[in-house]
Amino acid sequence: MLRSGVIAKKVGMTRLFMEDGKQIPVTVLQLDKLQVVAKKTSDSDGYSAVQLGAGTAKAKRTSAPMRGVFAKASVEPKRKLVEFRVDADNLIEVGEEIIADHYFEGQFVDVTGTSIGKGFQGAMKRHNFGGLRASHGVSISHRSHGSTGQCQDPGRVFKGKKMAGHMGAARVTTQNLQIVRTDTDRGLIMIKGAVPGSKGGWVTVKDAVKKPFPENAILPAALASAAAEAAKQAEEAAAAAAAEAEAEAARLAEEQAAAEAESLAQAEAEIAAEGSDAAPEGDADKKDGE
C-alpha cells in the first residue's frame, strides 16, 4: 500500500517528558503549507504519483514556467517540491493541504534528508578507522589510514577504497524512526531521535518500508479540508445536542411547574374543604353556651 509522504522542515531537537517520568529526545519537524501541486496518473503519465510543495517562495524569484505550474494548481509559489509515488486509489486532488495528522503516535517512518557537510575529513572520522599506534615506531602517521592495497600486482588502488575525502552533504535515509507526538494546530511532528540534516533543512517523511503498513493509517492522506468538515460536523452535532438538552430542560421545568401548580391547587382545595367542615361545629358550640 503506497500513500503519499510529507515534506517537512527540521526545526531542531528537544525532549519530551512522558507520563511515567521518562524523557525522550525528539526532533521537531514542521509542515509549512504542504499542498498538492500536481498529480500523475497512469493514463496520462504512465505511473501514479503526487507532487507536493511546501514553504512559500517569492514570485519574483520563481521562474516563469514554475509560476505557470503554481497558477494552474491555484497555489502560491512553493520553496520545495517533491514527488511521491502512490497507488492509483491514493491520489489526492490538486490544491489539497496535508496536515500533521497524516501520521499517528507510535508509527514508524523513514526520514530522508541531506546530512550536515563536514568538509574534507580523514579516514578515522570519515570511516571510523582505528588509526595507527601511538608509539612503537609510529611517527607522524598516527591518524593515517595505513595501507591502501597490495604490491605490483594489481599495482593500483581498487575503486571504492575507504580513504580520506569529502564527508557529509549527502542524501541520507534513516529508517524505522518512531513518531512520539503530533500537533495539528501548529503543524508539528515530533520524531524520536535524530534525523539527517541541519536546522532549517528540508526532509521527507514516508511510511516505514520495513514495517507492516499500519491499519489505522489515513487514506489517501490527512487533509485539512476533511479535518475542517469533521470539525464543522462536530460543532453542528454539539449545537444540536445543546439545543436538545435545552429543550429537555425546558420540558422538565414545565412539567415541574405544572406539578407544583397542581399540588398547590390540591392543597388549597383541601384547606377550603377543612374550613367548610369546621364552620358548623363552631356555630353549634356557640348555641350550647347560650
Swiss-Prot record:
InterPro entries: Ribosomal_uL3, Ribosomal_uL3_bac/org-type, Transl_B-barrel_sf. Residues 255-274 have a biased composition (Low complexity). Keywords: Methylation, Ribonucleoprotein, Ribosomal protein, RNA-binding, rRNA-binding. GO terms for biological process: translation. GO terms for molecular function: rRNA binding; structural constituent of ribosome. The modification N5-methylglutamine is found at Q152. One of its GO terms (cellular component) is cytosolic large ribosomal subunit. The keyword Ribonucleoprotein applies. Methylated by PrmB. SUPFAM superfamilies: Translation proteins (SSF50447). It comes from the Bacteria. Residues 250-290 are annotated as: Disordered. NCBIfam families: L3_bact (TIGR03625). Part of the 50S ribosomal subunit. Forms a cluster with proteins L14 and L19. One of the primary rRNA binding proteins, it binds directly near the 3'-end of the 23S rRNA, where it nucleates assembly of the 50S subunit. Belongs to the universal ribosomal protein uL3 family. This is Large ribosomal subunit protein uL3. The gene is rplC.
